[in-house]
């Protein structure tokens, strides 16, 4: 074979190789231009707003569009119009924070039947393909009681100020709080009652007043909801109970730093909700692309957060865990802006 023919063959092989490489690269890339609906518990909760913003950041990086839609109340009924809007728009995916694990399922299953992918984040639902968990559920619940116990010197009565009575994440955390309380370490601590503020500031403040009136010997309040803990802190900071009642839970540094500095709250915990939404954004995009299906062992890349693996959750269903909770104190709370 002469030199010219060798050159033609070599060029042909090179072009073919480039084509194969390009095809493989294209198959691994995200197909941009999709629309995804983020349906928070409600649109007024600052925590949910931050999480949704993280989701928008992820989808913008991927060249997609985010629509945030929900009601202004923490109920499943208030989320139904948003789900129907996603169905009508033939959205590529829905990311929802459940107010009720089952009530939204008929509508979500209708969405799935037409090809819309469904992921839950922050608070789980029964009919999703994947759950983006802010931290290991058991770790959150147990660490809340561990922190409360330390702050109460492991003795006295305390109450829990939760969100909605049907909130999946709240109930799961409280389950593990109760399990942690069975340890001998907490034999001198007593949970007197669980109150529900429905993630409404006014209702949460009233619940705080009610528990203090009902239990004059109350020593602590545990609130695993950002609305609950900030509302309770606001009331306590202007009352005779400031510095006398231990208040801890899950809070936003931006809302809680004032109460940490004025002595109302010593320590509280959370994770970065912006990162939670960001992770959910990458996960729903990967699912819409067919890169993951929600099967245990699936892997995907989540932008700045790196590599994630789908694992089996405590209930046996697939989930992705953002990371461990973080404890905020007067020494570090000013370092955070979310």
Protein language model annotation of sequence segments:
Residues 2-9, 24-338:
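A residue-level marker of the well-folded mature domains of exported/periplasmic proteins
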Residues 10-19:
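Bacterial N-terminal signal peptides
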């Amino acid at each position: 074979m002469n030199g010219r023919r060798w050159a033609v063959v070599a060029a042909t092989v090179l072009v073919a190789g480039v084509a194969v490489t390009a095809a493989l690269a294209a198959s691994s890339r995200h197909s941009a231009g999709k629309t995804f609906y983020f349906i928070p518990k409600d649109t007024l909760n600052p925590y949910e707003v931050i999480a949704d913003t993280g989701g928008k950041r992820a989808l913008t990086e991927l060249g997609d569009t985010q629509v945030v839609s929900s009601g202004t109340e923490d109920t499943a009924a208030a989320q139904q119009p948003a789900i129907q809007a996603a169905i009508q728009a033939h959205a590529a995916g829905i990311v929802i924070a459940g107010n009720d694990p089952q009530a939204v399922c008929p509508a979500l299953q209708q969405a799935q039947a037409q090809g819309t992918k469904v992921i839950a984040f922050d608070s789980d639902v029964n009919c999703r393909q994947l759950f983006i968990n802010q931290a290991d559920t058991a770790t959150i619940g147990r660490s809340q009681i561990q922190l409360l116990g330390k702050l109460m010197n492991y003795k006295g009565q305390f109450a829990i100020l939760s969100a909605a009575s049907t909130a999946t994440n709240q109930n799961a955390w409280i389950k593990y709080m109760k399990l942690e309380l069975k340890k001998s370490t907490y034999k001198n601590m007593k949970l007197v009652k669980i109150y529900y503020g429905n993630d409404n500031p006014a209702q949460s403040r009233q619940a705080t007043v009610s528990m203090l009136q009902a239990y004059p010997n109350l020593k602590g309040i545990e609130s695993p909801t950002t609305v609950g803990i900030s509302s309770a802190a606001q009331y306590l900071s202007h009352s005779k109970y400031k510095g006398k009642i231990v208040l801890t839970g899950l809070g936003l540094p931006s809302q809680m730093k004032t109460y940490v500095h004025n002595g109302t709250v010593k320590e509280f915990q959370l994770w970065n909700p912006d990162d939670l939404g960001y992770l959910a954004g990458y996960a729903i995009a990967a699912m819409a692309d067919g890169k993951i299906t929600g099967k245990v062992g699936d892997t995907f890349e989540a932008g700045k957060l790196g590599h994630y693996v789908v694992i089996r959750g405590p209930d046996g269903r697939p989930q992705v865990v953002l990371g461990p909770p973080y404890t905020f104190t007067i020494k570090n709370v000013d370092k955070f802006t979310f």
